[in-house]
Amino acid sequence: MAKATTIKEALARWEEKTGQRPSEAKEIKLYAQIPPIEKMDASLSMLANCEKLSLSTNCIEKIANLNGLKNLRILSLGRNNIKNLNGLEAVGDTLEELWISYNFIEKLKGIHIMKKLKILYMSNNLVKDWAEFVKLAELPCLEDLVFVGNPLEEKHSAENNWIEEATKRVPKLKKLDGTPVIKGDEEEDN
């Protein structure tokens, strides 16, 4: 089997392709590397100006080495092998959008540190309990959530009460699974 691509190698390729220096760039795309990236290694720490980092469609198992990314606002990690949210604390004060669909996340432990997170795309993961889902209510800025394809959503959508139950537990949501959330008190006026 081919050796995994390191972040350092992927950054060197990206620099060659774009002519930009990774340490100065605001947006860096390292998605779908061949062979895939397996580790978020220490080379990420040089991305001091990066505001949007895409590492989607690789084979990353752990979120790590984000401490140097002081300006990171958007992190794209969809289609990897991530099992938990450990490692996000390093960007807890800046991250506004986390795209982490198509992974293997079952628990939302550690999400509460995301003080500025507005958008969370985490469809097609393994969250199956309300006890995990309610942790999203601890995010003061969360407005837009995509949660379709998690066992919890599938179960309640089949029972036709997903949106009602989810918005009851995370009342600040403005958009759920791509649909604007209509607040109950507005409906009562009809």
Curated annotation (Swiss-Prot):
Domain LRRCT: 150-190
Gene that encodes it: DNAL1
LRR repeat residue intervals: 49-70, 71-92, 94-115, 116-137
Organism (species): Homo sapiens
Single GO MF annotation: dynein heavy chain binding
Disease field: Ciliary dyskinesia, primary, 16: A disorder characterized by abnormalities of motile cilia. Respiratory infections leading to chronic inflammation and bronchiectasis are recurrent, due to defects in the respiratory cilia; reduced fertility is often observed in male patients due to abnormalities of sperm tails. Half of the patients exhibit randomization of left-right body asymmetry and situs inversus, due to dysfunction of monocilia at the embryonic node. Primary ciliary dyskinesia associated with situs inversus is referred to as Kartagener syndrome.
Modified positions (Phosphoserine) in chain numbering: 56
Subcellular location: Cytoplasm, Cytoskeleton, Cilium axoneme
Homology family: Belongs to the dynein light chain LC1-type family.
Misc: Outer (ODAs) and inner (IDAs) dynein arms contain the molecular motors that generate the force to move cilia by ATP-dependent reactions. There are two mechanosensory systems that monitor and respond to the mechanical state (curvature) of the axoneme. One system involves the central pair microtubule complex and radial spokes and the second system involves the outer dynein arms.
Keyword Hydrolase belongs to the record: no
Subunit structure: Interacts with ZMYND10 (via C-terminus). Interacts with DNAH5, a outer arm dynein heavy chain. Interacts with tubulin located within the A-tubule of the outer doublets in a ATP-independent manner.
Gene3D superfamilies to which the protein is assigned, alphabetical: Ribonuclease Inhibitor
Keywords of this entry: Acetylation, Cell projection, Ciliopathy, Cytoplasm, Cytoskeleton, Disease variant, Dynein, Kartagener syndrome, Leucine-rich repeat, Microtubule, Motor protein, Phosphoprotein, Primary ciliary dyskinesia, Repeat
PROSITE patterns: LRR
Expression across tissues: Expressed in tissues carrying motile cilia such as respiratory epithelia, ependyma and testis.
Name of this protein: Dynein axonemal light chain 1
UniProt entry tagged with the keyword Cytoplasm: yes
One term under GO cellular component: outer dynein arm
